[in-house]
Amino acid sequence: MVIMTRLLLPFTHGIDVSAITRALALAHNLGATLVVLSLIRLPQRPDRGPRWEDIQQSNDFLEFVQHKAARSGVLVERVELYTHHPVGSIRALSQEMECAGIVLVVRRGTGVLLATHEVKQLLEDQRLSLYIVPLLAEASMFSLPRWLSHWFRGR
């Protein structure tokens, strides 16, 4: 019987190349499948839908991680959720998918891929198994045009 190890990488905003690269390296080193969870926040008002920019960023994130994972030989499972409560959804999905842990990326005490307050809420929950990935101070923000030009050249 093969035991599949899963690590959950949650995302709410701010595509960061170095964060994604480090999460993929962690999954590779542990022989784990990376469950890539993109959370799209729903507005509190029921007559409003999610922002188009949030949906587009979610799609970009999932595609970018899929591409990087394929190049590094890491298995990924993509999940996109629309939610009013991102942290609660992270907890629930981690348990539902039997993830060995949740990958949280930070830079200088600030959340990366998640808002800082979301990272803090997850850190406060002692029931969760967490993998904290610290990044160096310099930022490596995602540039869709640059990524697309590299991707098309590589095909």
Where are these regions (language model features)?
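Conserved hydrophobic residues forming the short capping helix/wall of the S-adenosyl-L-methionine
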Residues: A27, V65-A69, S94
